[in-house]
């Protein structure tokens, strides 16, 4: 069994725990590969065990950090590798275990006492070209000038769904329903569902409301506004776009896979949402 290890780079506790995990696996005879960016911030791993995330070819990834660490993994890895996530972030909607449970969780993984939780992702086409990372949480179309609204139309499966004047538009997965989409007034959606959430950001007037559409839907966005806009994917990738382009968003053929030890969803999500608000 071969493992990849990725840690949050701005917390020494996460980096030290990553080294303990690395040593724990190596002593027991398992292959362990460490993300090169983790190594740059904590250069105590063996150099022959270092690789870029884009080059990871492992059975599992152990992620030590918060949701941002998981999103970084998802944007850079080329394969759908199951992730065991250890929470060293702020809220940790995506993470599975706390730091104190790390080695208990790893032992359960080694014994096969887990299941794989698959989450849908979104693929974005700009003028028909899929050249940006898939989104685990959301794709956000944002105003390029603070204080200036975007005027756009969006279509669902070819039919006009709404014409919106707003600070932006968020298209989210159920996993991302607790993120930017919820800040835009969208609902919490069970992350196991196959749906897509569309939520305008501060629309004028407030007659434009969030909607939930089937996961097989194709969402097309065209701009009436003539100003530059910003496209943001999971808060990790940003690009300035001219308003004459067309955007299509649909479910990606790829999925995110998480190692889980319980099938309970609501206790954790309810607690995290209350902590956030």
From Swiss-Prot:
Binding site for NAD(+): 67-68, 72, 137-138, 148, 165, 167, 178-183, 202, 236
Cofactor(s) for this UniProt protein: a divalent metal cation
GO biological process, one term: NAD metabolic process
Listed GO CC annotations: cytoplasm
Alphabetical keyword list: ATP-binding, Cytoplasm, Kinase, NAD, NADP, Nucleotide-binding, Transferase
The organism's place on the tree of life at top rank: Archaea
Any single Pfam family the record assigns to this protein: NAD_kinase_C
E.C. numbers: 2.7.1.23
GO MF annotations in UniProt: ATP binding; metal ion binding; NAD+ kinase activity
Enzymatic reactions: NAD(+) + ATP = ADP + NADP(+) + H(+)
Active-site residue numbers: 67
Region forming the signal peptide: none
Subcellular location, record wording: Cytoplasm
Family: Belongs to the NAD kinase family.
Family matches, as NCBIfam families: PRK03708.1 (NF002984)
Protein role: Involved in the regulation of the intracellular balance of NAD and NADP, and is a key enzyme in the biosynthesis of NADP. Catalyzes specifically the phosphorylation on 2'-hydroxyl of the adenosine moiety of NAD to yield NADP.
Name the UniProt record assigns to this protein: NAD kinase
Lineage, opening ranks: Archaea, Methanobacteriati, Methanobacteriota, Thermococci, Thermococcales
